[in-house]
């Protein structure tokens, strides 16, 4: 089993549990150059809020889009957008990535901005 398939297996297991519980999810995805975050409805078919370093508004605020500073900005923005839609409680779906570095920074910034998980 290679690294990518192991990550996808971990993500599938976590998503299965969240789907059974019927909770709103804060889903992240990271690449070496960008980080993405979405708040997905419990039914899994609707994106309630989203933010990523691809957006011009966010990429203008940071020098480089693939570091912790960029992840913190994305976490803050996605939390603000979710709160504007009335979503306060979410489950953190790290998509099989380790809770370390940019993933942890995004989560901490979202918590500081008002999301609870």
Swiss-Prot record:
Family membership: Belongs to the universal ribosomal protein uL18 family.
Species for this entry: Pasteurella multocida (strain Pm70)
Entry keyword Kinase: no
HAMAP family membership: Ribosomal_uL18_B
NCBIfam families listed in its UniProt record: L18_bact
The organism's place on the tree of life at top rank: Bacteria
MF (Gene Ontology): 5S rRNA binding; structural constituent of ribosome
Protein name (database record): Large ribosomal subunit protein uL18
Gene from which this protein is expressed: rplR
Keywords assigned: Ribonucleoprotein, Ribosomal protein, RNA-binding, rRNA-binding
